[in-house]
Amino acid sequence: MIKNICAGLLILCQSSFNFQDDFEYNNNEEFIKGVKNCALFYNADLPSKDRIPIEIIVGQASLESDWGRSRFALEGNNLYGMREYDLTEPHIKPLENLEANFGLKVYPTKCLSVVHYIETLLSHRSYAEFRENMYNMWVVDEYDIFLLTEMLYNYSADKDYAVKLRRTILYITERGYLNGRK
């Protein structure tokens, strides 16, 4: 409960935030700060039981976009590898599969990519088990980030995805990137 109040107060102090604004970064720490700010601001408007842990949001953005350096992140503000199957919508085709029946979604800003990712985890049937576990952790106010990463097995075809995500989250937390200390 206290964590939720603190997150809400932090957001209120950053009231000039706008999802239409983009963030810039020159290194991993700046990238994490940008993603974190987008996530905190959006999470503040969600019921506390629906707030995706920041470690997972930042960890997946870092893993999926190579710390914001991937072609899809640079050209399409797509930090999570989100696909677009309606090819009349803005998208970028994967270079290795130009004939694919999908592209990767293009977003006006990186923050809107973060919002879409959060909404996907909160609504898509593939992540029902993730949501159920997250809710149970919310009830007792004790989150096991690494157990939650196991529930994201549908996010990638890579059978080692959860292991890679855990390593990325450990890298981020051990360096204090989420706390603003390096």
Spans of features found by a protein language model:
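Sec-dependent signal peptide recognition
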Residues: 1-8
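Catalytic cores of secreted/periplasmic lytic hydrolases that degrade extracellular macromolecules
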Residues: 8, 16-59, 63-182
